[in-house]
Amino acid sequence: MREADPECRFVWAEPLIHVAPKNHDREEIRAAEQFRCGQFEVYDMLTGHSRPELGGDPSFVDVIGLNYYPHNQWYLNGPTIPMGHHEYRPLGDMLVEVAERYEKPIYISETGSEGSGRPAWLHYVCDEVRDAQSRGAEIIGICLYPITAYPGWDNSRHAEAGLFSTIGSDGERHPYLPLADEIRRQQDIFAGLA
């Protein structure tokens, strides 16, 4: 690809997760950490840090994309870890870990929440991104996803997510104003840091 366009950049996206042990049993701790570290397998192979027979090289990754949602932290073979719980790992710490591991620019390739929690989730993610940036992580963007409400992927529930509603009886999509206000607020904060 770079022969055709030397300026092309390879941008990838993988989930960012945290998996905690359900108890302090040594085997449970080891298994949880092994599962958690599995999130790095793709980037390790692409960059040549593991499985060198696959031909990976650091030049194959220009930007690290990370998908992060409220349900991306859980106990091994168990439930989601709620934000604020002592086992919940701050997103900023997770971003710094990835930045130090790969020394590449990062962007949040997918993030968002459902219902009335959408603005608070974006506020949290942006605060954590700024925290990671203050510790040296190069984070170049955040992608709110999905941008519109949608029917559930594996059931018929209606997922009120993103900035815009489903198409209403007037044939239009309408913005969710609390999230629109939070987006503007976060844009102003980031602009003030530039």
Positions of predicted regions on the chain:
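Active-site region of glycoside hydrolase catalytic domains
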Residues: 1-118, 127, 131-194
